[in-house]
């Protein structure tokens, strides 16, 4: 089973598999965020973090490769009265635009292999404006065993 099939299968359930509240670590960064600007939510899944960033006043691009997750992300944004652009692409191969975002966020980076992380983080760094903020949270790959 491919990674796409695995994630699409997980996200194709009616429930939000990670819930609808933002990641705790991300929410704890609220006072550090700019009051306006553009944010990129990488591997945003069902949109809980992208929606929260939009609620903070940021213009959000939510990036994920699962169509089922993106349908739920759009529903969650609508339910919360915010808008965000939803882009379907593999986060490891997306053509990250240069210096386009004030904030770049990736939560749960452990789902990418070390080689994939290098590709993704290179793109994320490219997409970050000078002086911008990058927020990354993850665990070791061993965490996936639990």
Predicted feature descriptions by range:
Residues 1-34, 36-45, 142:
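Conserved class I S-adenosyl-L-methionine
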Residues 59-64:
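Conserved SAM-binding motif I beta-strand of class I
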Residues 66-68:
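Conserved SAM/SAH-binding beta-strand->alpha-helix loop
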Residues 80-92:
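Conserved SAM-binding strand-loop segment of SAM-dependent methyltransferases
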Residues 92-103:
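A short acidic, Gly/Pro-enriched loop at the edge of an enzyme's catalytic core
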Residues 111-124:
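A short, conserved alpha-helix within the catalytic core of class I
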Residues 131-139:
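Conserved beta-strand signature within the Rossmann-like core of class I S-adenosyl-L-methionine
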């Amino acid at each position: 089973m491919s990674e796409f099939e695995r994630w699409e299968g997980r996200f194709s359930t009616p429930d939000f598999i990670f819930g609808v509240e933002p990641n705790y670590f991300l929410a704890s960064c609220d006072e550090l965020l700019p009051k306006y600007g553009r944010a990129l939510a990488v591997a945003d899944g069902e949109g809980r973090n992208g929606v929260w960033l939009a609620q903070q006043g940021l213009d959000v691009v939510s990036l994920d490769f699962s169509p089922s997750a993106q349908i739920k992300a759009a529903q969650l944004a609508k339910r919360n009265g915010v808008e965000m652009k939803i882009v379907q692409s593999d986060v490891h191969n997306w053509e990250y635009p240069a210096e386009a975002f004030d904030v770049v966020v990736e939560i749960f980076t452990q789902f990418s292999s070390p080689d994939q992380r290098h590709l993704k983080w290179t793109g994320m760094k490219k997409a970050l404006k000078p002086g911008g903020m990058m927020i990354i949270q993850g665990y070791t790959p061993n965490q996936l065993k639990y």
